[in-house]
From Swiss-Prot:
The protein, known as: Protein YIPF5
This protein's record includes keyword Cell inner membrane: no
Regions crossing the membrane: 126-146, 148-168, 173-193, 196-216, 236-256
Main localisation: endoplasmic reticulum
Disulfide bonds: none
Recorded topology in the membrane: Multi-pass membrane protein
UniProt topological domain (Cytoplasmic) ranges: 1-125, 169-172, 217-235
Length: 256
């Protein structure tokens, strides 16, 4: 028994009294203290207490329903887009279409004796050539000849051949777009020949003479522009010969 008494004395702390067990225990108070001790308080994490009256307080809306308040200032267009629309170039300029240059190139082809501007002719402009190719095919269609495939195919092969030939002959070199542009603009006299084919038949002496004049007109204009743009002085005849072969094929399509 003495050992058992010593065990009880060692088990309990010296400040603990068995008589305290007889006192009543308030579960509600203890539970409230326990929940208060371990409850999560979101406002304590922010470092301060916010009174309830400040949480319920709202700023009154002083503006009207369909009108913003005076303090609202919309963002400027410059800050959103970086620059105004007035500073942007026109759409035709971004696409590389210049009607002034197109008109000057057309006049250069229509006037074979006019001096060509090498700076303008060296540009890659395919808007005018596409229009002239469509016009040439349309006039052939009016004459009862559906030859759009031949027109585009011969044009592509001719441009490729002239591109290779001019790069071999010139010192500066030339781009494929420049060759296509010049040959396309010089197709304009051939549209006149196909327009005559709509009115009367070209299978005769008059048609052959007219076709020869148109071929010489086209080849002379194309060679003049190539000589001016590529600085190939004294080589116009050498350039005009392959051009005459190309436009001769178009003349055969128009006549026959």
């Amino acid at each position: 028994m003495s050992n058992f008494d010593n065990f009880n004395t060692d088990f309990y702390q010296t400040s603990y009294s068995i008589d305290d067990q007889s006192q009543g225990y308030n579960y509600n108070a203890g539970g409230a203290q326990h929940s208060k001790q371990y409850a999560y308080d979101p406002y304590s994490q922010q470092g301060g207490f916010i009174p309830p009256e400040m949480m319920n307080q709202q700023q009154p809306y002083t503006g009207q329903i369909y009108q913003p308040t005076q303090t609202y200032t919309p963002a400027a267009t410059d800050s959103v887009y970086g620059s105004t629309f007035d500073d942007e170039p026109p759409l035709l300029e971004e696409l590389g279409i210049n009607f002034d240059h197109i008109w000057q190139k057309t006049l250069t082809v229509l006037h074979p004796l006019k001096v060509a501007d090498g700076n303008i002719m060296n540009e890659t402009d395919l808007a005018g050539p596409m229009v002239f190719c469509l016009a040439f095919g349309a006039t052939l269609l009016l004459a009862g000849k559906i030859q759009f495939g031949y027109v585009y195919g011969i044009s592509a092969i001719g441009c490729l051949g002239m591109y290779c030939l001019l790069n071999l002959m010139s010192m500066t070199g030339v781009s494929f777009g420049c060759v296509s542009s010049v040959l396309g603009y010089c197709l304009l006299p051939m549209i006149i020949l196909s327009s005559f084919a709509v009115i009367f038949s070209l299978q005769g002496i008059l048609g052959i003479v007219l076709a020869a004049l148109i071929i010489g007109w086209c080849s002379f204009s194309a060679s003049k522009i190539f000589i001016s743009a590529l600085a190939m002085d004294g080589q116009q005849v050498l350039v005009a010969y392959p051009c005459a072969l190309l436009y001769g094929v178009f003349a055969l399509i128009s006549v026959f």
